[in-house]
Structure formats: C-alpha cells, structure tokens
Amino acid sequence: MGLVVKDISKTFGEKSSKTEVLKDINFEVKDGEFIILNGASGSGKTTLLTILGGLLSQTSGDVVYEGKSLFERHTNKAHLRLNDIGFIFQASHLVPYLKVLDQLTLIGKEAGMSSKEAQARAKELLTKIGLEEQLNSYPHMLSGGQQQRVAIMRALMNHPKIVLADEPTASLDASRAQEVVEMIRKQIKANQMIGIMITHDESLFKYADRIVQLYDGKIKNS
C-alpha cells in the first residue's frame, strides 16, 4: 500500500514571528520505491524527513502507512523509530568504543532480539557488504566508505519498513557516494521497503525511481 503524506504543514514560532516551513505537502511512495527529495537549502527537505521519522511533530496533516497513521502504529515514537524506520545520516555516527559487530547487535537487542538472533542478523548484513573480516574492528580502523556502509546496515538491522537518508554521501568522494547510494537502492528493492533520500548531488539522481522537488516549503513536482 505504501506511504501517503497528506497535507503536511509545519510552522515554527508564535503569532507575529511565525514561519511556515512546510505548506500542504502531499505525495505517495510505493513499497519498493526509492525517491530522492531535492531542493535548495531552506526548502524544507530536512524538516519533512524529520517529521516522517517521528523526530518532529507536524503542525497539521498526517502520514499514513498501510491504511493507518504512521504515528499510531506504536505506543510512542521511540518504538516507531526502533521498529519501523531506519535512519541514515550524513555522518555514520558509529559508537567509537564498539566493535563493528556490536554496532548492529546493540540495535537488534534494543528491539527485542535475543543475543543469538542479533548476532546472526548482524553477521548476515555485514557479510552482504563484504565486512565479514572486520567484525571485531573499531570504527577508526575503517575507511569513511566502510563506516557509512556499516551505518546503512545498522539502519536495516530491525527489518525497517521505511528507510530515511539525509545526505548520506555528503562526506564521501564521488565513487564512494555512488557505491553507497547503489547499496541503499539495492536493499530497498530487495526488501520492498520505502526509501526516501535527501541529496543535492545530481549525479545520484539516476538511482532514484522518482525525484520530488521542494521549493519554499511546497512540492514543486512529484
């Protein structure tokens, strides 16, 4: 059924100092579809992604997934983020004192997996990206591209239904950026997830099924 964004608006401030950052945003994303959000700085992209991830409340409107408000699927938004949504950020944000394997198993156990289940899932994911030999390595022992690949697999650890990526290649060179986005797309397609990524890099547009342009808080095209 996919994800339906319905009339999402977001206003910051009060009374005379109000600023409307998002204005009646409407679009849909099908299961297995990978879209890119694009627009100038200040167009509302990150605000929208933050609302979709349950990190910020909208002023009005709703986000519907499988016929039900996304924000009512769990008792609180923390459970939503842990179980249904995988986040990938500009920086990998790996925990410096945790080994690669533990970066993933920690997330799995927080979602209710047993240690055995979490280890098996983590090893499966890390093998997919060719890091099975680095399970006991620390983040500083990996390249920037390897760290971001671990961050992607961490986002997929709990079988999320929705993957949200905010400029995940901003700190990578062109070849690494393409490799990372191709990996994100491949996982979204293979697992029929919903993928939404923000990027300014037009060379990455070819990986998207569709580009959604934002301009001044509104959808310019979808």
Curated annotation (Swiss-Prot):
Protein EC: 7.6.2.-
Residues that hold ATP according to the record: G39, A40, S41, G42, S43, G44, K45, T46
Intracellular or extracellular location(s): Cell membrane
GO molecular function, one term: ATP binding
Entry superkingdom: Bacteria
Bilayer topology annotation: Peripheral membrane protein
Assigned keywords, A-Z: ATP-binding, Cell membrane, Membrane, Nucleotide-binding, Translocase, Transport
SMART domains, alphabetized: AAA
Annotated ranges, domain ABC transporter: 3-222
UniProt signal peptide: none
Gene Ontology cellular component terms for the protein in this record: plasma membrane
Family membership: Belongs to the ABC transporter superfamily. HrtA family.
SUBUNIT field: The complex is composed of two ATP-binding proteins (HrtA), two transmembrane proteins (HrtB) and a solute-binding protein.
Protein task: Part of the ABC transporter complex hrt involved in hemin import. Responsible for energy coupling to the transport system.
Record's protein name: Putative hemin import ATP-binding protein HrtA
Higher taxonomy: Bacteria, Bacillati, Bacillota, Bacilli, Bacillales
Gene behind this protein: hrtA
